[in-house]
């Protein structure tokens, strides 16, 4: 069998082997692992073969077999395995057979598994026997000894491994047994190993790790005698063991104990003196470990204070020794070292709120200065990658918390120190870019601190306070500062633009508002902003310029300035579509800058709208200047016979640009549009329709056309747009490849039309003509049977649910915009029965609770509109009163509503009121019942009473239910109904 196993291992590890053969090899090896015969074979091979004759791969596999079977053996077999392992170990030691590290680790893991099975009763002297193997002073024996103990810890003591309650209980029993039998001998052996510094570095390192692992659940007194502590601390001076020594000391500090004892432990360790004497100039990893050790000292002292405030003086004494070390690490040139002491600093500032004796102004001043200096970029960080930028931003955010914490403790210190830093960084002589950037960053922080009132000033007086006036002065000086123009650095430029956009409200209220805003616009439209050579700054500034213009809305009455802006921006408005590609993960990657470019188009629309109407000729000129290149582009796309994907994408982008320009114009005050501008938008609408006709089979062009028209709607009056909309709807609706998601979006678009033109006769007639075909198409799509392929595609199911929501929202738009008469006109009344039927169908289907809830809301709407003798009750529907009542609809709704109200919560097993979604549906059902009762009065109550009685509800309960329906207000009735359902279903 040995040869079979070896052959299977070779095949499994051979990268060039036949895949089917490899699968067979893995299956065979797994069978060996899982069978008793495989275990017997493995044990026999290991025990009978000379220790140096088995090849490594085979030996590793045999160890795996033993490990996987160890917990399933009976006591006799387990004892045999234990004896065999010790015999093998003895042979290895005697023959000084040093296997590769991975084999020694695996054997140690086998020992650990066996230990958990035999130590309690079968082999109580397991650890004694293990310790005995080290008496020869063999380095190999010590190596195995330490590895086995570390593996035992992994099995029974590692807190980061999740275990079942049974295993946790077993491990507690094992630890109790170790404490009572072997703890003292084990700890003594570890310090004996450490006292002999001639032992192998690997053995010494393992031993330090063992102490770190076991101290958590062993008697602390065994570890903290002066001699023991000196032994451990001595290893801080040994290069190969010092990192592990730091971890060991941290674990000793973490040991849970009474506050007084912990304070004594910190004093005994005297680590502040030790750390102060260590050379921290060479090894960065070691410096980081020492910093974490210092941080842990601080955290433990604060825990002592939290648990026993009476120890404040002693804790403060220790903290005063610690602070110089912490401040040194905080100011370290490497951020990873600095971050190591962040937890202590954060907790310290929190503790200072309770114990003001912990700090002095001098300490906090030093801490504040160190914090601010760490916020500064290194001067050589000239072109950091995005990940580095993100990490530094997070680093700064944590430092800012310290800054704010200090500000809340000593506001005067903060108000005095930070403005000095800002002034020195920004306005005192020539400074390198990183100093200037720090000044802008601190200026932004300063404003945030004032906004969040970390200085605890009276809220009503913040805007009049000296710090706020200082901030205003700094910001104005910054806007007018020449260095913004002179210093060509991306971080300076992006920081400036972010800062001025963030503080737009200050600019809007400033006495020199116009001058400042125009100065900023000038900088935005210079090579520092929109035309920046740095992609990141340039693209970000496109968005920020749009935000700035939208938030400040300057009055654009300077024709020369406007033309200058347009002239600068025109090269950026050239649309050049680029097809997406796929990356190495096969994800679609968008190419080109069109998404960013849309901010420029929107800004241009906004800019034109900010020109006063007395300059209407300029407005028209600029609209034409924006539109005409796009019209030319679309004409070119249409003229190309071969509609390749790149041509379709170019047409899509051009249509989106038209819509986006108009969306920007939509921000004009009070939506008053000069007729000349309306005419230009009308021209754009015609161009969109011509393009759509020529690209009607393209989903992206249909989407872009709908997008554009959605933006035209607020500007074009109904007389102009009704004909356009008729054509748009006809083209899109007749497309042969219309997707479900498109229909959903289209319904949303129609809802917008219904809202915008709800009083317009032309649009009413347009919707009236289209409603029946719309309902038929939507319900036809939703009723299509699910094919086998669709059942494997959750996106189709998701799209259908979205379509249900879309049609329900469209019905809602019709009703809330006072157009319910559309449902019962001569053209559409035949579809009403189907619509109502679908509402009940969707209400019953709680596979998507959002759909069910929305359907019930529409039923409430229908009851409100038709619930009184079928006559439309909405007085604002100007066509409703001329239409005859819908005969029988109120009684039909009454019957179906009552059925729904009790069948849905009681017959659906999954309808559990503990789930918030179902609880909301129950509340909507209560509203549905209450609405009908208010509409039909006694007639509804009588029908409901008969229904409940027929369903088997007692007369008293029926009377109580009906009485509450009549007498309770809506809020209380919702509570009552939920309680009623819960009690009847036997839910808690």
Curated annotation (Swiss-Prot):
Q: What is its main location?
A: nucleus
InterPro entries xrefs: ARM-like (IPR011989), ARM-type_fold (IPR016024), Exportin-1/Importin-b-like (IPR013598), Exportin-T_C (IPR045546), XPOT (IPR040017)
Q: Which gene encodes it?
A: LOS1
GO annotation, cellular component aspect: cytoplasm; nuclear matrix; nuclear pore
Matching entries from SUPFAM superfamilies are given as: ARM repeat (SSF48371)
Q: What does this protein do?
A: tRNA nucleus export receptor which facilitates tRNA translocation across the nuclear pore complex. Involved in pre-tRNA splicing, probably by affecting the interaction of pre-tRNA with splicing endonuclease.
Where in or outside the cell it occurs: the entry states: Nucleus; Cytoplasm
What protein is this chain from?
Answer: Exportin-T
Q: Name one Pfam family in it.
A: Exportin-T
Superkingdom of the source?
A: Eukaryota
Family, per entry: Belongs to the exportin family.
Species the sequence originates in:
Lodderomyces elongisporus (strain ATCC 11503 / CBS 2605 / JCM 1781 / NBRC 1676 / NRRL YB-4239)
Q: Cross-referenced PANTHER family, in alphabetical order?
A: EXPORTIN-T, EXPORTIN-T/LOS1
Recorded GO MF terms: small GTPase binding; tRNA binding
- Which one GO biological process term can you cite for this protein? tRNA processing
Keywords tagged on the record:
Cytoplasm, Nucleus, RNA-binding, Transport, tRNA processing, tRNA-binding
Cytoplasm listed as a keyword? yes
